Structures are given as structure tokens and as C-alpha cells.
Amino acid sequence: MSNYDRYASPRPGAGYARSGVAVDQGLRAYMIGVYNYMTLGLGVTGLVAYAAFTLGTVDVGNGRLALTDFGHAIYASPLRWLIVLSPLALVFWLSARLNTMSVSTARNAFIAFAALIGLSMSALLVVYTGASIGRAFFAAAAAFASLSLYGYTTQRSLSAMGSFMMMGVIGLIVAGLLNMFLHSTGLQFGISLLAVVIFAGLTAWDTQSIKQMYAGGDSYEMVHKKSIHGALRLYLDFINMFQAILMLTGSQRNS
């Protein structure tokens, strides 16, 4: 975790009295911290997803899987709803309490959130082949890197686009809830296609917004917490874009 202490000199958030060079160095350290935390979250998610998949399934040959007792508990029992919904409660709590919690509490909450997402996303390993998951991941990573770079470097304000994309997220949620009852393949395809576009736009907007959050004269501790919150936003953009790409392009295992 020592990698995240590179804010120490110069300290970002020390106010506007610093030179332009110090501001640039502090901003760079702040953004590196954001991406480091995001990478940590993705690593935790991947490890937990793989561990849950390994413990929850057994290979019975010809690419077919059978569920273990643990697999039945997390994939085919009411417990799965707790696994799906608990990250939502945690992310709301983290966002609401960010200003008052300590850096260590914020960090631990983010790691716990990433672990819960990994447990939930392990179901994707049951449904889709490893090769198609890998392709979707690298496609999402390439798109994310390009869009985040654009959001960081562009001089154009993306706030209007961001507001529009947030309305799109609400639409995706409503459509997703509706499709839980309709089970429409066509509607699911449309939802996934729109999700790629929406979270691509949010990646650029969130990056610009996170960059702008830096210039606030905040304390050293608050800048650390802002970097964790920024990492959470970009983490969610990436995870949602990855899942949408996987649903569009993924190859399912033999049933």
C-alpha cells in the first residue's frame, strides 16, 4: 500500500499558492493514485471471482460444469440476491460517508466493495468461456485507456455529455428491471449496446471530473479519500463496460 503514499512530496491539495510545476506534479501524483486504486480494485475483483468460480464448480468434461455445494449457495440460492445487492448498499454508504471517514476506512470499504463485485461477477465465469472473457476484458481495457486519456487531456467541457449519460444510466436500470420479467434477447442486446456507449462516455467525463476535483485546496487526507472515490467511479465505468462488451460478444459454455 506504500505506493499510494507518493502524494507526500509535493502534497496535492495544499492550495493555490504553489507554483505551476508543483501543481502539475501534485496532479500527476493524484491521478496516478486514482489509477493505482482502480487497478487494485480490479485485481481484487479478478482474484475473488476466480476463487469463487474454482470453489463453486467442478469440470465434468466436454466443457461442462457442475455446481458444488458452495456453488449452489452463491449461484442458485436466495443468498445470490444478497451477493448482488450488498455492493450497492456499500457504494452508497461509501459515497455518503466519504467526508467523515478515515483514509484507511475508505480504502478498506473500497476493497470490500471490489471483493463483493468479484463474488457476484464469478457467475460470468460459469456462463462464458475463458477465451471470450479475455477478449472482452482486453477490448474494454483498450477502450477505457483511450477514453480516459481523452477525458484527461481535452480542453472541452464534458459536463453536458456527462449529465446526458447519467440519464442514460437511469434508462438502463429501468430497462434492465423490465427485462427481468420479459426475458427478451433483443432487449438485452439493445441494453448491452447502449451500455457500451453510455459507460464509454462516462469514462471520459468521470476522468475530467476527477481531474478537476484536485484543484480544491484540500488537506492531504482529503486528497487521498478523493483519489479512492475517483477510483471507485472509474472502476464502475470499466466493470460495466466490460460486462456489456462480454454480453455482446461472449461465447457461452456448453450447457
Locate the predicted segments by residue.
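A hydrophobic alpha-helical transmembrane-helix feature that marks the membrane cores
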Residues: 1-255
